[in-house]
Amino acid sequence: EEVFISQLYRVAEGFDSSLATLNERTKSLTLTKEQRLEFERELSIAEAVAILYRSVANQADFIRHRDQLGTVADRSGAKSRLKELLLSEIKLARRLYELQSADSRIGFEATNHYFYVPDDLMEKVLNCRYLLENWVEKI
């Protein structure tokens, strides 16, 4: 479980780091407006992938901490981590919403049509906020 979660975080961090490097190294490239727009569209796909990996890692980490609530000595530490994960998920869902709203390729898969739509991402934010305000505070 720990290895699985840590590997997902490593993949997400690898995407984030690679995107930062790519952005830094391509700032000074001379591109036409059309080329720059196309390049930025491709960057948004990579950012969406990074978000998805981080979200999967967050969700696995959330489940681990939730399931340990009854057995851990440091209940406040677990509660604090659950809050961090929910806040992270809200931030990720909002960013993914922005990316998907700008690029219909994000969240789309031809045979299933959509894995998720913008409304799903808004609902995720609401669900995370509900858990923060109504569940985490009561555990």
How would you name each of these model-derived features?
Residues 1-139:
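Catalytic domains of carbohydrate-active enzymes that cleave complex glycans
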